[in-house]
């Protein structure tokens, strides 16, 4: 025998099973605690999309204004439930370079896609501006006449848990030709 009788490599009593269950429960709670803050934060953020907005009327008004001001229109498809939509909005409102190009060269419209899969909002606009299947947020750039210049998934603009300001800026610049 390799070990003395007093040394036990495994306990076979019920206390070992209880100990294992407590450890498993503790591990599950730690994982849950790590996941919940991000979900709670996204739900507690202020609404940036307006589900009651008449997007067709707003786009029509933006086209008129864009023609006068010689700017493009940036449609940002997403929803208040979407953490990535809030992250992109945060970048648009906080990064000085991105904020400047948006203010100078674009009119922004946030297009709410709805919260319920069976009851989507603005589905016709999602299809018209070719962002169907992209995931959210998705971008569509219109010229000053309202013609679609490009539709873009924002997945390629991501970096870590947010959007890369340099990639977003490069995308916005390519749409205005500078």
What residues fall within each predicted segment?
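Structural micro-motif
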Residues: 72, 123-142
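Solvent-exposed loop/turn segments at secondary-structure junctions
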Residues: 80-84, 91-92, 113-118, 146-148, ...
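N-terminal leader/targeting and pre-domain segments
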Residues: 40-69
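Typically the conserved alpha-helix immediately C-terminal to a functionally engaged Cys/Sec
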Residues: 86-101
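Non-catalytic, surface beta->alpha helical segment in thiol-disulfide oxidoreductase systems
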Residues: 134-177
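Short active-site neighborhood of thiol/selenol oxidoreductases, capturing the structured segment around
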Residues: 69-82
């Amino acid at each position: 025998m390799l070990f003395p009788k007093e040394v036990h490599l495994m306990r076979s009593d019920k206390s070992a099973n209880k100990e294992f269950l407590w450890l498993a429960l503790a591990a599950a709670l730690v994982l849950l605690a790590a996941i919940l803050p991000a979900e709670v934060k996204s739900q507690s953020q202020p609404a940036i999309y307006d589900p009651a907005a008449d997007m067709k009327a707003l786009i029509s008004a933006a086209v008129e204004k864009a023609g006068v001001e010689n700017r493009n229109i940036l449609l940002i498809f997403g929803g208040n439930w979407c953490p990535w939509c809030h992250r992109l909005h945060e970048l648009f409102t906080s990064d000085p370079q991105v904020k400047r190009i948006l203010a100078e060269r674009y009119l922004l419209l946030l297009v709410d896609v709805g919260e319920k899969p069976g009851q989507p909002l603005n589905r016709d606009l999602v299809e018209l501006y070719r962002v169907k299947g992209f995931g959210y947020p998705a971008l569509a750039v219109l010229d000053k006449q309202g013609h679609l210049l490009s539709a873009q998934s924002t997945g390629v603009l991501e970096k870590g848990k947010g959007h890369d300001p340099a990639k977003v800026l490069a995308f916005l610049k390519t749409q205005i030709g500078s």
